[in-house]
Amino acid sequence: MRKIFLACPYSHADRVVVEHRFQLCNSVAAKIARSGSVVFSQVSMSHPINAHLGDLDKASIGKLWAPIDAVFMDAMTEIIVIDEPGWKESSGVQREIEIFKNRGLPANLWSEVSHEFGD
């Protein structure tokens, strides 16, 4: 059984873009789960919680999530990146990819592996 950490760019000045990314993560995570694989989507988990962290700035929110993400990344055996616009520029996505590569684990783009999870 595959154990997948799902990554996607998240932050953006336009709240509509952020919401789109959240919904896209949910859709992709559902597809992966239906295939029988384990999936952890950090954006799917954190987005609703972030709505209750209005007193924190972006940097503080990132610091809050970093150790939580690390626990989930340690449990997963590959990362799949939703390669939406902004994924290459996302420091969070790049950090997550690097963590998996440093562990010798696969790092794939959704556009290249989506066919492995059915229609």
Can you describe what each PLM-predicted range is?
Residues 1-119:
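Conserved catalytic or regulatory cores that recognize and/or transform ribose-phosphate-containing ligands
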